[in-house]
């Protein structure tokens, strides 16, 4: 990895470490999403505690954390594998933010933002998959898991040179959802819009 790639990777992690959910909740004088609801600083939990406006703001900011560094690397001509490393660094920053005591979110929105520079057709298909599963079953975590499982295949169809880094990124997100998988199997996972949760760290 050359100096430019290393700098881009470090910058991606630091940008990913800026917790949009925590900062937006502070700005709107809402409870800290790490301490209420599902205890997850992501758009789904902010939707529960702050409504649609706050959740959309978090979603867009989290996506930009992935888009900005990957798009920068893309235009600088960085190798696809290194672009994947940059994307993973941004998601790791979101999941384990150095600025917020390493207590972060699940990385779905940031990963979507990181995939966007590959192509709008791929991004649209990924978003359509998430929305379809979410509308049908009303589980944010299930929608995320189904989406990340099929995204490497979508990538292979549209831009096969990016399949490996995208698959690596998807594996990271599946790992971060291990508790959600357990709750889905036991029927304890809360649905989108539910206010009360019985366990921490849902979607």
From Swiss-Prot:
What is this enzyme's EC?
2.3.1.275
Superkingdom of origin: Bacteria
Q: Which UniProt keywords apply?
A: Cell inner membrane, Cell membrane, Lipid biosynthesis, Lipid metabolism, Membrane, Phospholipid biosynthesis, Phospholipid metabolism, Transferase, Transmembrane, Transmembrane helix
Q: InterPro entries under this entry? A: G3P_acylTferase_PlsY (IPR003811)
Q: Does the keyword Transmembrane helix apply?
A: yes
Catalytic activity reported: an acyl phosphate + sn-glycerol 3-phosphate = a 1-acyl-sn-glycero-3-phosphate + phosphate
Query: Could you tell me which SMART domains the record lists for this protein?
Result: G3P_acyltransf
Q: Which GO terms describe its molecular function?
A: acyl-phosphate glycerol-3-phosphate acyltransferase activity
Q: Which Pfam families match?
A: G3P_acyltransf
**What pathway does the UniProt record associate with this protein?**
Lipid metabolism; phospholipid metabolism
Q: Which residues cross the membrane?
A: 4-24, 68-88, 117-137, 155-175
Q: Where in the cell is it found?
A: Cell inner membrane
Task: Tell whether Lipid biosynthesis is among the UniProt keywords.
Answer: yes
Gene Ontology terms, cellular component aspect? plasma membrane
The membrane-topology field of this record reads: Multi-pass membrane protein
* Gene Ontology BP terms: phospholipid biosynthetic process
Return the PANTHER family for the record: GLYCEROL-3-PHOSPHATE ACYLTRANSFERASE-RELATED, INNER MEMBRANE PROTEIN YGIH
Q: According to its UniProt entry, what is the function of this protein?
A: Catalyzes the transfer of an acyl group from acyl-phosphate (acyl-PO(4)) to glycerol-3-phosphate (G3P) to form lysophosphatidic acid (LPA). This enzyme utilizes acyl-phosphate as fatty acyl donor, but not acyl-CoA or acyl-ACP.
| Family, as annotated | Belongs to the PlsY family.
Subunit info here reads: Probably interacts with PlsX.
What is the designated name of this protein?
Answer: Glycerol-3-phosphate acyltransferase
What lineage does the source organism belong to? Answer: Bacteria, Pseudomonadati, Pseudomonadota, Gammaproteobacteria, Vibrionales
């Amino acid at each position: 990895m050359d100096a430019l790639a290393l700098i881009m990777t470090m910058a991606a992690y630091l940008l990913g470490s800026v917790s949009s959910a925590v900062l937006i909740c502070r700005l709107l004088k809402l409870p800290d999403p790490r301490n209420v609801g599902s205890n997850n600083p992501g758009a789904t939990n902010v939707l529960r505690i702050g409504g649609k406006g706050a959740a959309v703001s978090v979603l867009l900011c989290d996506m930009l954390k992935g888009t900005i560094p990957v798009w920068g690397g893309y235009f600088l001509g960085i190798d696809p594998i290194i672009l994947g490393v940059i994307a993973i660094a941004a998601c790791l920053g979101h999941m384990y933010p150095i600025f917020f005591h390493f207590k972060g979110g699940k990385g779905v929105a940031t990963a979507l933002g990181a995939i966007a520079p590959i192509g709008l057709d791929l991004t649209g298909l990924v978003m359509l998959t998430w929305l379809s599963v979410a509308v049908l079953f009303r589980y944010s975590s299930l929608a995320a898991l189904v989406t990340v499982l099929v995204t490497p295949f979508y990538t292979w169809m549209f831009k096969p040179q990016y399949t490996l880094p995208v698959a690596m990124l998807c594996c990271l997100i599946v790992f971060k959802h291990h508790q959600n998988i357990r709750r889905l199997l036991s029927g304890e996972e809360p649905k989108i819009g539910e206010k009360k949760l019985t366990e921490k760290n849902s979607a």
